[in-house]
């Protein structure tokens, strides 16, 4: 059965035939049969070089044999116990040893859960209620994340999804990423009521937006001066650029960190952690409640440990070289055709925008979405899969070869030529 038929069947079961909106695109999404290494194969018999990589977890490539073996071995010993196991100790230990700032942690089942619990913990620890998030920053699908700015930079956010109560939105203030003056104004008005600022240190859910020099240091300074916590959402960036969270690369110590994706080796996972002083407020050692039937389940723990153990010896510089080659190739092709564009990226993640600039959410939202989608569809015709939306991120994995990069550049050149006609 092909993708079109499966989509018709799926549409009677799931809203628009999918279980996450990012997987849908017109006229219908492709349905995957299997994936291996840098390749993903659909049920229609097509093969693609994959740069979506499940939106970030698959840094080793699809179906890494060491991770698959670890999952199989653990599954034979039991899928879930409802009790602690050594598997969670092993994964927690390798994360703590490779992070300068995470003294204690708690595993969850998704990045959404991790940020939700981190926000609750920050409010409990500070005794304050207001959370500051960045416009366009994505921290999962819970109510406190699904907030966008109102008409003014100092107004409380309004819900960006029906079902989020206005009362919830009033506890979230939306700031502008890379805009120090805006954040200062927010603190001048609400400083004594702000529990925490939560931000992706590199925004990865509005395409890729990198921090301007000094911006993250500024956030650290202003939160400390006002008695607020700083939460880094490293669900995407944790272990993406080095064998550590991104915060260790730049030398900034947040109070709390959330992670996910890569640390699960492809299995569902989330984590929130930080100093022991803050984390000891989590139940049962403290009174901030958090739980989950599948939290710390042994199969996920085994997959995550196998992935991180393998990453520990990997050459991250090779990812940078291949990503830069691909970014430069894309930039050259678009410049040659005199197409207005920006290619944003950091080490092994990148995105291309058809805009004058892409330094913040407002600029990104002005990009030409139609041109991006036309190129996306043609790239698929030429055997390359990138995210259907330019507001997502491309990733390069250790499974991508130099030949993959060269083939992708060739496909991009053809696709741009076809889309620009």
From Swiss-Prot:
SUPFAM superfamilies: PLP-dependent transferases. This is Glutamate-1-semialdehyde 2,1-aminomutase. Pathway: Porphyrin-containing compound metabolism; protoporphyrin-IX biosynthesis; 5-aminolevulinate from L-glutamyl-tRNA(Glu): step 2/2. GO terms for biological process: protoporphyrinogen IX biosynthetic process. Pfam families: Aminotran_3 (PF00202). The keyword Zinc does not apply. Belongs to the class-III pyridoxal-phosphate-dependent aminotransferase family. HemL subfamily. GO terms for cellular component: cytoplasm. HAMAP family: HemL_aminotrans_3. It catalyses: (S)-4-amino-5-oxopentanoate = 5-aminolevulinate. Its EC number is 5.4.3.8. Keywords: Cytoplasm, Isomerase, Porphyrin biosynthesis, Pyridoxal phosphate. It is found in: Cytoplasm. Its main location: cytoplasm. The modification N6-(pyridoxal phosphate)lysine is found at residue 261. CDD domains: OAT_like. GO terms for molecular function: glutamate-1-semialdehyde 2,1-aminomutase activity; pyridoxal phosphate binding; transaminase activity. NCBIfam families: hemL, PRK00062.1. InterPro entries: 4pyrrol_synth_GluAld_NH2Trfase, Aminotrans_3, Aminotrans_3_PPA_site, PyrdxlP-dep_Trfase, PyrdxlP-dep_Trfase_major, PyrdxlP-dep_Trfase_small. Transmembrane segments: none annotated. The lineage of its organism: Archaea, Methanobacteriati, Thermoplasmatota, Thermoplasmata, Thermoplasmatales. The keyword Transmembrane helix does not apply. It is an enzyme of class 5 (isomerase). It comes from Thermoplasma acidophilum (strain ATCC 25905 / DSM 1728 / JCM 9062 / NBRC 15155 / AMRC-C165). Its cofactor is pyridoxal 5'-phosphate. It comes from the Archaea.
């Amino acid at each position: 059965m092909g993708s079109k038929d499966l989509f018709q069947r799926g549409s009677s079961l799931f809203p628009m035939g999918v279980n996450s909106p990012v997987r849908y695109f017109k006229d219908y999404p492709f349905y995957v049969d299997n994936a291996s290494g840098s390749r993903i194969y659909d049920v229609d018999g097509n093969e693609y070089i994959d740069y979506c990589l499940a939106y970030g977890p698959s840094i080793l490539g699809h179906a890494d044999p060491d991770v698959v073996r670890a999952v199989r071995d653990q599954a034979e010993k039991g899928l879930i116990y409802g009790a602690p196991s050594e598997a969670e100790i092993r994964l927690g230990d390798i994360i703590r040893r490779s992070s300068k700032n995470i003294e204690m942690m708690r595993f969850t089942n998704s990045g959404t859960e991790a940020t939700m619990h981190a926000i609750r913990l920050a409010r409990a620890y500070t005794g304050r209620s207001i959370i500051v998030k960045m416009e366009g920053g994505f921290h999962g699908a819970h109510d406190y994340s699904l907030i966008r700015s109102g008409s003014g930079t100092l107004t409380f956010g309004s819900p960006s999804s029906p079902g989020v109560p206005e009362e919830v939105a009033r506890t979230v203030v939306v700031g502008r990423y890379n805009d120090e003056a805006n954040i200062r104004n927010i603190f001048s008005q609400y400083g004594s009521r702000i529990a925490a600022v939560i931000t992706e240190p590199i925004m990865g859910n509005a395409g890729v937006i990198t921090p301007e020099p000094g911006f993250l240091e500024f956030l650290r300074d202003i939160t400390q001066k006002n008695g607020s916590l700083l939460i880094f959402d490293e669900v995407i960036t944790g272990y993406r650029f080095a064998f550590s969270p991104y915060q260790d690369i730049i030398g900034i110590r947040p109070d709390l960190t959330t992670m996910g994706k890569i640390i699960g080796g492809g299995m569902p996972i989330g984590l929130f952690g930080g100093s022991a002083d803050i984390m000891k407020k989590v139940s049962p050692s403290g009174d901030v409640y958090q739980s989950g039937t599948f939290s710390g389940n042994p199969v996920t723990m085994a997959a995550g440990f196998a992935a991180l153990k393998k990453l520990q010896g990997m050459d991250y510089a090779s990812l940078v070289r291949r990503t830069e080659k691909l970014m430069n190739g894309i930039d050259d092709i678009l410049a040659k055709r005199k197409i207005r564009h920006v290619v944003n990226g950091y080490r092994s993640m990148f995105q291309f925008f058809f805009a004058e600039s892409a330094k913040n959410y407002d600029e990104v939202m002005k990009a030409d979405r139609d041109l991006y989608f036309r190129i996306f569809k043609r790239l698929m015709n030429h055997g390359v899969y990138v995210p259907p939306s330019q507001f997502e991120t491309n990733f390069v994995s250790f499974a991508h070869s130099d030949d993959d990069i060269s083939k992708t550049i060739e496909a991009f050149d053809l696709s741009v030529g076809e889309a620009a006609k």
